[in-house]
A protein has these predicted regions:
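Topology signature of small-to-medium multi-pass alpha-helical membrane proteins
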Residues: 2-152
Length: 152
């Protein structure tokens, strides 16, 4: 793989993680700003919102707000990761893939496979993070192969 190809892949990975991060930051803020039933209905968009009751116990609101906080910091982390990936950081390439990827594994297993969400935006964001991870691996290992070839 040429250096130009590696750079292009890293730029694409950056754009994917920044989009993913901004969407999750917005979701985090909206989750915290709303009461639990509205927050849950916002995420579980394939479920009839009428099934969510008007109020939940304050502990349920706190739990949902914790989830919103996690979405917010994870989104911020991946946006920052995108900045450092743009600059060629292999460390941030790895950690951004781990943080964003593990987050979406849970979403995929419990929400997508559970049938609680529509394809857009949730499943699309899982595809975005999966694509970023695959392209990260191609850029990293393709670039490593190029370095090995240059030495020999």
């Amino acid at each position: 793989m040429t250096p130009a190809n590696t750079t292009l892949l890293l730029r694409i990975v950056t754009v994917l993680w920044v989009i993913w991060g901004l969407v999750h930051m917005l979701a985090g803020v909206l989750t915290i700003a709303q009461v639990a039933p509205a927050s849950i209905a916002g995420v579980a968009d394939a479920v009839d919102p009428a099934v969510f009751h008007e109020t939940y116990h304050a502990a349920a609101d706190a739990l949902i707000n914790q989830h919103g906080f996690n979405l917010l910091w994870i989104g911020l982390f991946t946006v920052l990761g995108g900045v450092f990936i743009w600059r060629g950081s292999a460390t941030w390439l790895f950690f951004t893939a781990v943080v964003g990827g593990v987050t979406d594994v849970g979403y995929f297993v419990f929400m997508d496979l559970g049938g609680y969400v529509n394809f857009f935006p949730g499943t699309v964001m899982t595809i975005v993070s999966g694509s970023a991870i695959v392209l990260s691996a191609v850029a990293h290992f393709g670039g490593a192969q190029q370095q090995r070839d240059a030495v020999t």
